[in-house]
């Protein structure tokens, strides 16, 4: 039986790891043992930060919406409440984009939210649902 030598596969694995470690600082880029650890850690960071990116962007959108609604005399929470009561379902990413690029359209949404909030103060929920429909 022929002797199994693993030179080709291990060389390919090492090459793969070193390619992933390209651009790292110091021995992390060219020493296989250290490069392997650095690549594993970088993949952990990448996995974690893909989740964090979603949170960060949502927080950014909310801050932008809050700033834009304050210009119209409303807080973020009241604005979202007003939109929900008016039956307007636009996500925060689109609202943030509208606040920056289409201020007139955003102002119209704020006005609708204000109307829904004021209307609900003076009526019952059933009367509001029939008026909106």
Curated annotation (Swiss-Prot):
PANTHER family assigned to the protein according to its UniProt record, in alphabetical order: 39S RIBOSOMAL PROTEIN L20
Function, as annotated: Binds directly to 23S ribosomal RNA and is necessary for the in vitro assembly process of the 50S ribosomal subunit. It is not involved in the protein synthesizing functions of that subunit.
InterPro entries in alphabetical order: Ribosomal_bL20, RIBOSOMAL_L20_CS, Ribosomal_protein_bL20_C
One Pfam family linked to the record: Ribosomal_L20
Protein's recorded name: Large ribosomal subunit protein bL20
UniProt lineage: Bacteria, Pseudomonadati, Pseudomonadota, Alphaproteobacteria, Hyphomicrobiales
GO terms for cellular component: ribonucleoprotein complex; ribosome
NCBIfam families tied to this protein: rplT_bact
UniProt cross-references to Gene3D superfamilies, sorted A to Z: 6.10.160.10, Ribosomal protein L20
Biological process terms in GO annotation: ribosomal large subunit assembly; translation
Keywords of the record: Ribonucleoprotein, Ribosomal protein, RNA-binding, rRNA-binding
Family stated for the protein in its record: Belongs to the bacterial ribosomal protein bL20 family.
Gene Ontology molecular function, alphabetical: rRNA binding; structural constituent of ribosome
Keyword Ligase assigned: no
């Amino acid at each position: 039986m022929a002797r199994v030598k693993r030179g080709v596969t291990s060389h390919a694995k090492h090459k793969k790891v070193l390619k992933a470690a390209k651009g790292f600082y110091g021995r992390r880029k060219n020493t296989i043992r250290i490069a392997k650890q650095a690549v594993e850690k970088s993949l952990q960071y990448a996995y974690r930060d893909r989740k964090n990116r979603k949170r960060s962007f949502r927080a950014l959108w909310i801050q932008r919406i809050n700033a834009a609604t304050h210009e119209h005399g409303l807080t973020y929470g009241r604005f979202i409440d007003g939109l929900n009561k008016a039956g307007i379902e636009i996500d925060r990413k689109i609202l943030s984009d509208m606040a920056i690029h289409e201020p007139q359209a955003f102002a119209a949404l704020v006005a609708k939210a204000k109307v829904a909030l004021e209307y609900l103060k003076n009526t019952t929920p059933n009367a509001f649902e029939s008026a909106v429909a």
